Amino acid sequence: MADKVLVTGGTGYVARACIAALLEKGYEVRTTVRDPGKRAAVRAAVESGAASGGKLSFVVVDLLADAGWDEAVQGCRYVLHVASPLGLGAATPEQMIETACGGSLRVLAAAVRGGVERVVMTSAANASSPDSYEEEGVTDETLWTDPDAPGLIPYRRSKTLAEKAAWDFMQNKGDTTTLSTILPGAVFGPVLSADNLNSVQVIGRMLRGEIAGIPRIGFEIVDVRDLADIHLRAMVASAAVGERFLATGEFMWMSEIAETLRASCGPQAAKVPTLELSDQQVRQLAETRPELREIAVALGRKNRHSIEKARRVLGWIPRSARETVADCGRSLIEWRLA
């Protein structure tokens, strides 16, 4: 009988990639949705990723409510806790933190009560980064972001607090359930549907000509397929117990992303911006456009993380950032989203 895996947040970009990867490996998958009307869309998205949806089932639960989580984990050997607020205006700071922290603790408590063997939780590289963007260099999993650092944006604070709360909870429980956490960078790559694309919207906006100029910012890019792969590796590897794993990739400036799209997407990339904005221009724009304020603090910074641990312990080898960006752009075009 195939092992059963619960994946939280089945409507999400990363969760769908994890579900598809699990189904392709023969696992039985149960995923959570808040809205029962989303079940058909999730199944269709997973099937578009060339995975059979025959072993996929659903449970309707909410990260902000206690009800239903014991039933959600029942019979599951593993849990991939992927669901989380994205940030960048997705919710108020208080809602973001409550969803991230409260939701994670609900999932973990249910997993412990239900005798789940392993929980793999999606955190973020932002939970293992210098407090400010003023420092550069390469950091690893031993670094924790200070959640009380002045000026820390709500998304970074929520991800850090949620992961800290998860580790504190598991340390105090002393049960047989084990925890591993995955800390991804900016998640791009092919899409499986036309909805819930927050992670790749910057690529779509560039292709649609909605970004007039390119700020001097960059991302450590991880492919959603590779991110799903590292979740599955951490799920079954005995050496992953009690460990954090950074899952970042190559750093690309936004100007390099634009160049890659123009080179790989042909005429459909005609609207990709070529104008590069000065730091001063971005800061001036940020004075009247709140959505640019989080970008302004990162101008010119190249914070990087080491993935040596994931390579050594899990044998994880991500694909190149340029391949990921190109595949993301072509996928958005195929879905008529750009």
Residues covered by each model-derived region:
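Active-site Tyr-X1-5-Lys
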Residues: 149-179
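A conserved pocket-lining segment of Rossmann-fold NAD(P)-dependent short-chain dehydrogenase/reductase
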Residues: 146-151, 193-194, 200-226, 233
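NAD(P)H-binding glycine-rich loop region in Rossmannoid oxidoreductase-like domains
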Residues: 36-37, 47-102
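Conserved Rossmann-fold NAD(P)-dependent oxidoreductase catalytic core, especially the SDR/UDP-sugar
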Residues: 81, 90-153
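Mid/C-terminal beta-alpha module of Rossmann-like enzyme folds, strongest
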Residues: 230-294, 312, 323-338
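Glycine/proline-rich active-site loop of Rossmann-fold NAD(P)-dependent oxidoreductases
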Residues: 173-176, 189-201, 234-245, 338
